[in-house]
Amino acid sequence: MSVPLAPKKSCFGQLRDHREGAKNNNESILRTGDTNANQIMLEVSSSCDEAKSRDLDDELGNSNLSRPQYHSHFQKEPLHLQGFGKGSQAGSTSQRESQASLTVHRQLSEEHAVKRGALQAPQCVQGPSLSSWRNAVGQASPEASAKKDAEIPRHIPKDKLAKTLDNEELKRASSCSAAAGSVPPTDLQPVQLDTLGPQDHVPARGEGPQRTPASHSPGKGFSPGEGTSEGNSVYLPKPSTSEAKGSSPSDTKMEGPHGLDVYNERITHAELTPSSASASKENPGLRHPEVCLGQGTGKSKVELKSVQPRNEEGLTSAQAQGPGCHEERSMSPVERQELLEKAYREATSQGNSSHRQLGVRRGSSLEEMTGVSAGVEGSQQATPTLSAAPAGEAGTRLTGKMSAGVGRMARETASGQTAPDVGQAAPVRRDPTESVPSEVSGEERRLGSGNSGSTKLLASGPSAGGSRTDTSGLLSPRGSNLEARKGKEMVAENRNLLENAAQTDNTPAGVDSAFSTPAPLLHPETTVNSSHHPTPPGSSSQELGVFSGDTGSPSVASPPTDGGQVLNTSPKVPDRTTCSSGIPKPPTHPKDTPSSQEAREKLETEKMEERAEAKPILMPKPKHVRPKIITYIRRNPQALSQGDASLVPVGLPYAPPTCGMPLPQEEKAASRDLQPSANMYEKLKPDLQKPRVFPSGLMVSGIKPPAHHFSQMSEKFLQEVADHPGKEEFCSPPYTHYEVPPTFYRSAMLLKPQLGLGAMSRLPSTKSRILIASQRSSASAIHPPGSLTTAASFYGSDPSDLKKASNSNAAKASLPKSGLRPPGYSRLPAAKLAAFGFVRSSSISAVPSSQSLDSVQPEQSRPVTRSTFGNEEQAPLKQALPSKDTPKGAGRAAPASSSNATTPRRSLLPAPKSTSTPAGAKKELQKDPEAKKPAVSSPKRTASAATKPHSPGYPKQRTSAPRNEFPPKPDLQAREAERQLAQRLRDRCEWQARQLGLARRELKKAIQGFDALAVSTKHFFGKSERALAKEKELSIELANIRDEVAFNTAKCEKLQKEKETLERRFEEELRRLGWQQQAEVQELQERLQQQFQAESARLQAEHQDQLLRMRCQHQEQVEDITASHEAALLEMENNHTVAITILQDDHDHKVQELMSTHEFEKKELEENFEKLRLTLQDQVDTLTFQSQSLRDRARRFEEALRKTTEEQLEIALAPYQHLEEDMQSLKQVLEMKNQQIHLQEKKIIELEKLVEKNIILEERIQVLQQQNEDLKARIDQNTVVTRQLSEENANLQEYVEKETQEKKRLSRTNEELLWKLQTGDPTSPIKLSPTSPVYRGSSSGPSSPARVSTTPR
């Protein structure tokens, strides 16, 4: 088995970035359609990067949802996709690419389903499914996927795409129609399916069902001509979601073979229509009615905008054109193949993440794919589902005609045709002509899912073609009716093969399952389905491999109206389409594929519940009382494991619809699925053992743990019950977003004693319940399944408490609320029940049956009371929600929520449905007897009912599911009769369930015990043999070791003795030597002491002699040095005196010169001064003379004037004689002033002269000062020189002193050395005489430096 490939973090990061870039650039994904309806994410997977981005998104989106079980299962289940195993690697790349594209589209659908989670259908089946495929493919053939990635051209010019599309449009038209059928509108994201088109050459059919994988991406999958299996391309106006729904019903009416294609087209159209509409708006040129399969009564004019396979680099324009397929047209077949390879790789890479992500996105995407692959009905229903509200109706209609058998046929055809056409038919072509009636298709689904698809896929599992076929089968459930029938015939064999090979092919099947499962995600209400949808890679693989067979189960998961094809995948109607058809066929997955089976079962259950919600109209029973027919079909624990119970919290409103009861067509597959695998049982055991897992209702009702599968007979009975449209419709859906977890009301009911019918009044009104349920459902939708599980546990009291309560009035009260269900039972969410393999029929009877299961165990007598309460309660509830006018959101929720509201305690029972549609409940009651009858009701009717979930009529569960009208409310008596009948049926079902559960439990325990015994026996037997052989060897070795030990011991003792002897000898010798050494040391010490004393005396004498000699020599040296020093001093003094005299002479001479110069200059200045003085004197004289003359003139003039004035005065002033005196005084004053002026002028002149003299003197003073400064500078220089000389003299003196000291030191050193030499060993050559050069040098050295130094100075 191939090793599971976990998505790399780097890949995740790249994909995330790529995805974000794609979102920002609209390169990878084009959203079209109403945001409220189902936004169709057109994801252009022209490049592997884009696919990876989707994968990453899917992985990211579903990473939380993805279960380790899914991964482990999917991966453990070697992705023996027929083309993904080693065989797949060997298989043609085109098939792989087809599968990759399928997976890409599925994953895209899943992504969209997840994204739409609450309200939007999966935009692209491609998302998680592709990642699931990647897991499958990557695991089985990681190399192949890598190669494909390399092969797929990321950049495909639009021109090339357009060119290649022209040739391939026809081929892909069929493949696209198949893809359209398999891929709900959510598959709009083109995964370069166009490229898959060339790769996925229709092996036998030009229709292109084989292209379904390639065509899966709505945009790419549907190229003009591809859209129709016939190659007819029709440009369809963007149908509104409601239009898409409407068209899907008509498409459902298409011919059987084309019905699938039409179904695909419908789904694609419905889903793609929003996207294609927007896409066509964006890219009218791109718009290709690729999926216009006019084969049926109405060719679904799917305006499939083939999404340009955008090369991340080259096709940026694809952002707007992403929906269009023109790129594909321009692509050459080779390029398309490369793109398909890229898509395949993306799918394989995304498969790993997608399978993990199937929990949510794949859930939806898988359901979508399942619905698509499951059958045209399912897909059509899914398509209506994708459409906003109309999708529900259209989905119902589509499901009515599109039979699950179509999906199965597609699967069978996919498996059969793909097996033959491994290379080309990797995507199994869906021949719309091959589509069979819903019954046949349901059977085909069972066969295809269980056998033909799975068997063929398994058979071809080794080959890539086989795996692709698987994918094709999943994608294009178009198996021919004959193939479907053959698949039925081969069901038994195929089941065995599927169970065996499905285990290996779990991953492929899981991928298909993932594709089929996406539908539930399409519905926000079906969010439960989304949570379930995460089909573990195993389940996806199984669904891929078993898509032919498993599509049925996926379709069951997304319960198709007929064959469990849950075409709820239609992303548009998120809530109801999930429950598109009657009881989904439990996938026939081997035990190894429990995750995928669980996921599919959950998806089927959810879809069936949704279908039940949508199909309440189909329910003939007018009363709300739900017959207590056991609707729990024990699904394979594997499916549960795939679905992972954790994904479906106990109280999770998202719990997959309990309508797990396969239609009679699905009985075989269901029985196969119902057969629990020991592995699954083990996996589920903990959950089963968990008290919260089984509400008291289950405990009391005696419902067996999911591990206990109902016998095939019981399953058939359940299926029959489910087959009844109403029953199928009322597969108790998981709590829709609008529903309140049944445990909520149930707990309330339990808390409040139920007093007769009056207890109903205590229950919240249907509307209030719906509101509460919607609030809770929204909360649950917001919260992940885990939280929902927690909520469920909160809502439901401990199973023991619930048992007690259910046994008590609470159980009875719960019956009215839930119809006939015991409170404890409803406590268990539908998802949990589905996870445990208990699939509730999708009919009202299924809901009551689930209730009856709960109630039957507590007490069969209670059912009567319950039925009474249920009738009363349902009547008010019906009144509360009697009309279709209830808001579509509420309507959708209302079916589920009202069912849950009616049975708030039973999350799995759509009590509100009966409440909302009392007529539907009555019809259900009426059908309860029919429920006893084999569910022979046409799958079409079931499908139509399933499609109805969105309509408010769904809660009514009328038999006329397509109609939204509510049947007239039957009177209370009729309802009572129906309730009683339902109670009886429930009692019977519960008894059978208990019997079957006990038998299965015992059988399983016996099998498990036997297996354990065999394993343990084998283990211990082998262990004992090995132990004996090893024991012998060890005994021999032990004997040898003992011998060696004895020998070594003897040797060691001998050595020890020798050692002791040697030690004694050594000690004795040591003592002897010690004594000898001490004696020698003493003798040596004495001798050395004597020698030392003699030598010391001799050395002292010699030292004295040498000291005397050294003193004499030193004295002589000192005298010589002193004499030489004195002589040097005298010489230096003489030289200094001479230098001083010379300097003084020079100084005197210079001073004299300066004096003479100064005198000369002084004389010159005096002469100049004199000259100037004389000149100035002359000027003064001149000026004085002039002033005298002027004064004279002034006097004369004054005299004349005076005379004149006197005369005049005398004449004129005769009377004024005194004026003369004044005049005289004034004259005197003037004279005085004149004198002062003259004096001042003289002073001024003198001062001027003094100033001139001062100036001259100042100049002379400056000159003298300069001279004085020069002389001072010279004196300073002389003094500096004198100081330097004196310093030098002092230095010389110091040097002389130092030399003297040095000489003294040297003399002392010499003396010491001589003394040492003399006192030393006479033979020593170092000894020197006083006359040696050392002495001479020492004696002469000191004086010479002084002389040398002084001499230069």
Curated annotation (Swiss-Prot):
<feature type="compositionally biased region" description="Polar residues">
    <location>
        <begin position="347"/>
        <end position="356"/>
    </location>
</feature>
<feature type="region of interest" description="Disordered">
    <location>
        <begin position="847"/>
        <end position="972"/>
    </location>
</feature>
<keyword id="KW-0963">Cytoplasm</keyword>
<dbReference type="GO" id="GO:0045171">
    <property type="term" value="C:intercellular bridge"/>
</dbReference>
<comment type="similarity">
    <text>In the C-terminal section; belongs to the MTUS1 family.</text>
</comment>
<keyword id="KW-0206">Cytoskeleton</keyword>
<feature type="compositionally biased region" description="Low complexity">
    <location>
        <begin position="893"/>
        <end position="904"/>
    </location>
</feature>
<dbReference type="InterPro" id="IPR051293">
    <property type="entry name" value="MTUS1/CCDC69"/>
</dbReference>
<feature type="compositionally biased region" description="Basic and acidic residues">
    <location>
        <begin position="325"/>
        <end position="345"/>
    </location>
</feature>
<feature type="compositionally biased region" description="Polar residues">
    <location>
        <begin position="566"/>
        <end position="581"/>
    </location>
</feature>
<dbReference type="GO" id="GO:0005881">
    <property type="term" value="C:cytoplasmic microtubule"/>
</dbReference>
<feature type="compositionally biased region" description="Basic and acidic residues">
    <location>
        <begin position="145"/>
        <end position="172"/>
    </location>
</feature>
<protein>
    <recommendedName>
        <fullName>Microtubule-associated tumor suppressor candidate 2 homolog</fullName>
    </recommendedName>
</protein>
<feature type="region of interest" description="Disordered">
    <location>
        <begin position="799"/>
        <end position="823"/>
    </location>
</feature>
<dbReference type="GO" id="GO:0008017">
    <property type="term" value="F:microtubule binding"/>
</dbReference>
<feature type="compositionally biased region" description="Polar residues">
    <location>
        <begin position="853"/>
        <end position="871"/>
    </location>
</feature>
<keyword id="KW-0597">Phosphoprotein</keyword>
<keyword id="KW-0493">Microtubule</keyword>
<feature type="region of interest" description="Sufficient for interaction with KIF2C">
    <location>
        <begin position="786"/>
        <end position="874"/>
    </location>
</feature>
<feature type="coiled-coil region">
    <location>
        <begin position="976"/>
        <end position="1319"/>
    </location>
</feature>
<dbReference type="GO" id="GO:0042803">
    <property type="term" value="F:protein homodimerization activity"/>
</dbReference>
<comment type="subunit">
    <text>Homodimer. Interacts with KIF2C and MAPRE1; the interaction is direct and probably targets MTUS2 and KIF2C to microtubules.</text>
</comment>
<dbReference type="GO" id="GO:0005634">
    <property type="term" value="C:nucleus"/>
</dbReference>
<feature type="compositionally biased region" description="Polar residues">
    <location>
        <begin position="239"/>
        <end position="251"/>
    </location>
</feature>
<feature type="compositionally biased region" description="Basic and acidic residues">
    <location>
        <begin position="598"/>
        <end position="614"/>
    </location>
</feature>
<feature type="compositionally biased region" description="Low complexity">
    <location>
        <begin position="1332"/>
        <end position="1353"/>
    </location>
</feature>
<feature type="modified residue" description="Phosphoserine">
    <location>
        <position position="365"/>
    </location>
</feature>
<feature type="compositionally biased region" description="Low complexity">
    <location>
        <begin position="805"/>
        <end position="818"/>
    </location>
</feature>
<feature type="modified residue" description="Phosphoserine">
    <location>
        <position position="364"/>
    </location>
</feature>
<feature type="region of interest" description="Localization to the growing distal tip of microtubules">
    <location>
        <begin position="786"/>
        <end position="1134"/>
    </location>
</feature>
<dbReference type="GO" id="GO:0005813">
    <property type="term" value="C:centrosome"/>
</dbReference>
<feature type="region of interest" description="Disordered">
    <location>
        <begin position="81"/>
        <end position="101"/>
    </location>
</feature>
<keyword id="KW-0175">Coiled coil</keyword>
<feature type="compositionally biased region" description="Low complexity">
    <location>
        <begin position="530"/>
        <end position="541"/>
    </location>
</feature>
<feature type="region of interest" description="Disordered">
    <location>
        <begin position="125"/>
        <end position="259"/>
    </location>
</feature>
<feature type="compositionally biased region" description="Basic and acidic residues">
    <location>
        <begin position="921"/>
        <end position="933"/>
    </location>
</feature>
<feature type="region of interest" description="Mediates interaction with MAPRE1">
    <location>
        <begin position="626"/>
        <end position="964"/>
    </location>
</feature>
<feature type="region of interest" description="Disordered">
    <location>
        <begin position="1"/>
        <end position="30"/>
    </location>
</feature>
<feature type="region of interest" description="Disordered">
    <location>
        <begin position="274"/>
        <end position="615"/>
    </location>
</feature>
<feature type="compositionally biased region" description="Basic and acidic residues">
    <location>
        <begin position="483"/>
        <end position="492"/>
    </location>
</feature>
<comment type="function">
    <text>Binds microtubules. Together with MAPRE1 may target the microtubule depolymerase KIF2C to the plus-end of microtubules. May regulate the dynamics of microtubules at their growing distal tip.</text>
</comment>
<feature type="compositionally biased region" description="Polar residues">
    <location>
        <begin position="89"/>
        <end position="101"/>
    </location>
</feature>
